[in-house]
Amino acid sequence: MKMKKIVVMSDSHGYHQMINRVKELEPDGDYYVHCGDSEAETYMMQDWLCVKGNNDWYSDFPNQIKFKVEDLNFLVAHGHRFGYMDRETSMIYTLQEANCDVLLSGHTHVPMYKEVDGYTLINPGSTTLPR
């Protein structure tokens, strides 16, 4: 069985050409996930699982999305919902409440991959405004 490919981006902040560019660079993705602050219209994100970020003022994207790939339950949420103090604890708690294994989030513009107590935290950073 072929392993599923999940393509994740975040915080493109209105650079809409980047959304298409990512798909061009990764045409064989099984899932395309945007972790918020796309600042895109809904129609632009048709093929994406996309959540609302703190700069997506006019979007009707959901605050969170859950999806399952093989035996893993994923939660997508923009990182501003986790605060700044005890951020990691808040992320783990949110995963536990949602009965998920992996959190895909954005907001900080800083890439991160961390495994904590059996949970996985992933932030792809920003495709256009990295820090």
Q: At which residue positions do the language-model features occur?
A:
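Conserved beta-sheet core of the metallophosphoesterase superfamily
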Residues: 49-51, 85-131
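Core catalytic region of metal-dependent phosphoesterases/phosphodiesterases
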Residues: 2-71
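Catalytic metal-binding/acid-base residues of hydrolase active sites
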Residues: 13, 39, 54-56, 80-82, ...
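Active-site-proximal beta-strand elements of phosphoester/diester hydrolases
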Residues: 5-11, 73-80, 120-125
